[in-house]
Amino acid sequence: MEERVLSSFENEKYRIRVFYEEFADSPNGVYDMVGVMLFTYDNGKLHEECDWRTLLGKHSDYNITMKEALKELVWKYVPHDKMIKFLKKGTEHYQLKWNKTKRRWQFWYDERVFGSNPCVLFSSDSEDMHCGYLDSDMLSKLEKSDIVELINKYGKDIVVTSLTTYGYCQGDIQEMFAYCTKERFNEMVETPKNNWKKKATEFMQNELKECGCWMWGSVYRVKVEEKVYFTKRYANGEEHEDFEYEDCECGQTFYCEDYDEALEWVKKDYIKE
């Protein structure tokens, strides 16, 4: 069965056609990206095709939520005292307050989001405020946006960004995240390293967009063929000019929202106005 042509362009020299690429790999698995890509299945667990191995280690279990993945970044890159400082200051969603009467810290939620009752986290005589305790009782209560704010504000040599992508059916939505360390940026990018967080974020936003296109099936293969001209000569002496197509590029893959966008990218390389 012949493939369906989604879009095409033809002139005296080339024929360019765009097809769906049904079996494309995730772009983060195809080529090196500046960011470490994190996205999930419909059940909220990390997707097998995201870069969970970079975050957790190749022998780890990737069956965790996005919030748990972001918390891993907190423990790796945010100093403990900065964590407490951030929690004390609070955000629009919560605030950590000291209850003088009960002599313990209490986690106060915005009742419009969490309900009116405070959640007791740890008492003043609990000197062993180790990471596991804080992980279960504190960071789990935060919104993902709060955790990202914490990392970007106090994380050492790391930047995190996110992008919300939408599918083609009602309710198709995916909030995808990416992070990059200063060390990784220096290895991946040859441009000047000043203001590296801003530059890394710009790279990662584009990379997340490509991963989102893959997630929703917006992947296209562009085939370029050159017209090779020749002359047919018949026994009766007649001549007829004809041509045949010769492959130039048979499988250039594009992760983009519209197939015409893929066509225009290739036309820039082959068609001179």
Language-model features and meaning:
Residues M1-E273:
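Acidic interaction surfaces
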